[in-house]
Structures are given as structure tokens and as C-alpha cells.
């Protein structure tokens, strides 16, 4: 039995398109702005959390929208980037490697940059045996 593939888009909560991005899974409006089967992960950094704690009104509104959407739909997932990078293994820390995103289930947090990417492989088949 085959399982449908899935993909996730990670976007920083402070990105200019964040509010529009929150709506891409809604089956309404312009179909060219919809992506009903794409999963979402909101990347939240320490800088944003400090703004939120300080009572920054714009941050509070954005955070509220995120939580309302999550309550209504179960998404987006939330990656706390600062906490993730604080928990990086020593090899990452000693080489200044940072995690910027995660996979759909959030169990894979690998360094990514212009030269490095990662993929979540749920299973594989070694065809060399056959």
C-alpha cells in the first residue's frame, strides 16, 4: 500500500508574507493562493519572543493569529529556533552550524544553508539486491 507524499513549508513568524501564508490551507479566496495539502511550520526566534514578552503590539497580534489558526486547524507547527539551536550537538556548536527549519513531524532538525539540505526519508529500498 502506498502512502501519499507530504511536504512542509517553514516560514519565520517575522516574514513579511506571514499573515498571507497562514491562510494558504483555507479552501476559500483565490485558488492561486491556496495550497490545501501543504503542511506549515512557523519558525519562531528568540528576538520575536522577546518582543512578545515586552508587550510589542504587532508581535502580540501576529502570535494571536498563529495560535488561533493552530487551534482551528492544528497547524502550523511551531519550531522555536532558539531552543532548538541551544540543544544542538557539540559538533554543530563547534562549527557554528544552525538549524533553520524542520521536517513535517519535527523530529529531524539538521543544519541547512545554501550548500546543505536535508530530506526526511521514511523508508527506502536497496534495489542493488534485486
Regions inferred by a protein language model and the residue ranges of each:
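Active-site cavity-forming subdomains of large catalytic enzyme subunits
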Residues: 1-129
Amino acid at each position: 500500500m502506498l502512502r501519499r507524499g507530504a511536504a512542509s513549508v517553514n516560514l519565520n513568524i517575522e516574514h513579511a508574507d506571514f499573515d498571507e501564508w497562514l491562510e494558504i490551507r483555507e479552501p476559500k479566496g483565490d485558488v492561486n493562493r491556496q495550497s490545501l495539502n501543504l503542511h506549515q511550520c512557523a519558525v519562531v526566534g528568540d528576538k520575536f519572543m522577546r518582543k512578545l514578552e515586552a508587550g510589542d503590539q504587532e508581535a502580540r497580534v501576529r502570535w494571536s493569529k498563529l495560535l488561533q489558526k493552530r487551534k482551528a486547524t492544528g497547524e502550523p507547527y511551531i519550531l522555536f529556533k532558539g531552543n532548538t539551536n541551544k540543544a544542538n550537538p557539540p559538533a554543530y556548536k563547534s562549527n557554528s552550524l544552525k538549524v533553520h527549519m524542520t521536517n513535517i513531524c519535527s523530529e529531524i532538525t539538521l543544519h541547512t544553508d545554501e550548500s546543505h539540505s536535508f530530506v526526511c526519508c521514511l523508508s527506502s529500498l536497496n534495489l542493488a539486491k534485486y
